[in-house]
Amino acid sequence: MKEQIQFTTSEKYKDNVVLRLSFEFAIRIVQFSEILEEKRKYVIAKQIIRSGTSIGANIKEAQNAESKADFIHKLKIALKEADETEYWLFLCNSINSYPNCDELIKQLQPILKLLNKIIGTSKNNIKQ
């Protein structure tokens, strides 16, 4: 069985799936960026670590939003960062001298889907 990674001390967040997935993804992004830096791919490593770790940070920030609109705004930022990260990962996969990152791309997909679903549901709740 996979060891549970601690991503919060708060009971409020412990069952937050998108927060947990984005934290686990950020760990993998840091590890991948370290591999890129070892291969002297500094520019891409910096871009990937910035956008890839920002996803979870924005999701966490959204948990303390001042309003529903603020919550949606912060999750949209997380979604933009996820889209940017996906771009960099596909770019890496397209260049032979870069390590393969199919697993990272696969790990990112449920985060993208959850963010889109949460944003859509939250927008619908505002309209009601």
Regions inferred by a protein language model and the residue ranges of each:
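Short, C-terminally biased terminal segments at protein or domain edges
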Residues: 1-58, 65-128
